[in-house]
Amino acid sequence: MTKYVFVTGGVVSSLGKGIAAASLAAILESRGLKVTLLKLDPYINVDPGTMSPFQHGEVFVTEDGAETDLDLGHYERFISTKMRKANNFTTGQIYESVIRKERRGDYLGKTVQVIPHITNEIQAFIERGAASATCGEPDVAIVEIGGTVGDIESLPFLEAARQMSLRLGRNSACFVHLTLVPYVATAGELKTKPTQHSVQKLREIGILPHVLLCRADRRIPDDESKKISMFSNVPEDAVISVWDADSIYKIPQMLHDQGLDRIICEELKLSPKDADLSMWSALVEKLENPKQEVTIGMVGKYVDLTESYKSLIEALRHASIHTSTKVNIEYIDSEELETNGVDSLKHLDAVLVPGGFGRRGTEGKIAAVRYARESKVPYLGICLGMQLAVIEFARDVVGLKQANSTEFDPDTPERVVALITEWYDREGKVETRTEESDLGGTMRLGSQRCPIKPGTMAEEIYGKDVNERHRHRYEVNNRFVPQLEAGGLIISARTPSEDLPEMMELPRSMHPWFVGVQFHPEFTSTPRDGHPLFRSFVEAALANKQARGVQA
C-alpha cells in the first residue's frame, strides 16, 4: 500500500518546497523505494498554460502533454519516475470535476459543499495520481501542497490532507512543514517567531507536523532548534536546518545528513536499505571542479525573471557537469538589442534563443540570430528560437524580405511560419485548431518521436530518431521549405505523420554549429544523464572559444 508524505509551506512562498520534496524523493529512491510526487496548486486556473511567465514562471510539459507547474521539472530531474498529467492538479480542475458530477446528478440531489465534496475530490485526485505512477505502485507518494499555510485558497487542500491521513490510519501518512527562519541584521539574530506562528496555524486546522524544515540563509544553531522544538511540539531531531546552498544538487545530502529520511521511514514504518547518495556527491564534485569555462548568451524577453527558463538553465548546468565546463549564462533582453544593436553579443562563446510567445522583442532576437549566423558563433534556437532562425534565413539569405510568422504579422505575404491547423497527438488522434480556438490547452503538446535525416548534425547528436516534448501553435510553413533548402538550410527531422519540420540546421560549409529545434529538449535533461543536444552545444561553444583564442 502506498504511504503519503504531505509537504506544506509557511510564512512566505518561494522557499523551495519543490526542491525539498524532490530531494526527499531522491534520498528515498536511493534507499530502494519506489517514489512518485504530486503537486497541488490552489489557483483557480485549470492549468498554468495561459499564465504569464512573470506570474508563474516556467510551464513544464510532461510526456503525455500536460502543461504543469515548474516543480514537476524538479521532480523529474531528481528521481527516475516520469511525471504525468495526474501528478499536478489545481483548484480549477477540482471544481470543474465536481461541477460536472453535479450536473450529471452524481450527488443525488445533495447540497454540494467544500466539505465533503471538494475535499473528497481532492483525495480522489491524490490517490489517482499516486496510482498512475510510471514506476508501478509506489511505496511513497510525496504530495506538495502549493501556497502558504494561512492562505484561504489552500484550506481545502490542507483539510483534504488532514482527512486523508486520518482515514488511512497511523503510519500511513506524515507531514513535513517548510518554514522561514529569517535573519534580522539589525538585531544580529535569527527569529523563530514566524515559524512558531506558522506551526500554530497548522495545528489550528488539526495538522501536527512530524518534521520542520527551517529555511534560513545560514545553518540554524542548536539553541534556536531547541526553542523551535519546544514551541512547535516537534521533536528536536526533527527540526531540520535547510540553509542556502550554491547548488540545489547539494540538498539531498544536506537533508540526509540531518536524518530526514530516517525520521520519515520510522514514521511510516518502512525498513528500506541504507541511502546511497554517491551519484549526487559525484555530480556536485564535477560541478564544483570544472576544467574549462564558456559564456553563453540567452536572448529573451523574460530575462528579469529567470524562473521562466528554469529547465533550460538546469539543462545547461547538466551539460556543464558532463563536459567538465563551467557554463556562465548571460541574460540579454531582446528589446535592448532592438535599440542598442548587437555589440553586447560580441564577447559570447555561443548564443541561445529560447521559446516564447508574442511579438514583443522578436526583432531583437532575429538580430541575435543574424549576428550568430554571420559571425559563425554557435547558435541553438528552441521552439520560437528555431522559427526566428528560419525567418532570419528567409529574409537575409533567401531574399524573402517580408518573411514573418502569422503570430506577429497576420497579413504578411510571406508566411514562413504559420499556425498549425491539424496534427496527430502522441496517441495518433487528429487534433485541429483555428485562429478562433481557445488559448488554453490548444497547443501541440507532449512527446512525439520522429526520424532524423541521415548524414546530418542532428543524426550525430541524436542518432536515427528523436523523441522530445512540444509546446507550440506555430510551425515552419512547408510551402517555403524548397526555397529555404535551395538557399542551403537543412530540415534534418520531420514528423512522420504530418511532415512538419522538427529540426533545422546549416551545413558545416556555411556554419560550424547552427541548430534549431521545434521541440523543448530542456524538459528531458537530467543531472544523471545530461542531454546530447546541450552537451554538443556546450562543446561547440568551447571550440569557438578556443578558435578565437588562437586567432587572438
UniProtKB/Swiss-Prot annotation:
**UniProt protein name:** CTP synthase
Q: Name one GO cellular component term.
A: cytosol
| Residues that coordinate or bind L-glutamine | 356, 384-387, 407, 473
Q: In which pathway does it act?
A: Pyrimidine metabolism; CTP biosynthesis via de novo pathway; CTP from UDP: step 2/2
Active-site residue numbers: 383, 520, 522
Q: What is the lineage of its organism?
A: Bacteria, Pseudomonadati, Pseudomonadota, Betaproteobacteria, Burkholderiales
Q: Which GO terms describe its biological process?
A: 'de novo' CTP biosynthetic process; pyrimidine nucleobase biosynthetic process
The entry's ATP-binding residues are 14-19, 71
The alphabetized UniProt keywords are: ATP-binding, Glutamine amidotransferase, Ligase, Magnesium, Metal-binding, Nucleotide-binding, Pyrimidine biosynthesis
Which residue intervals make up region (Amidoligase domain)? Answer: 1-270
Per the record, the similarity remark reads: Belongs to the CTP synthase family.
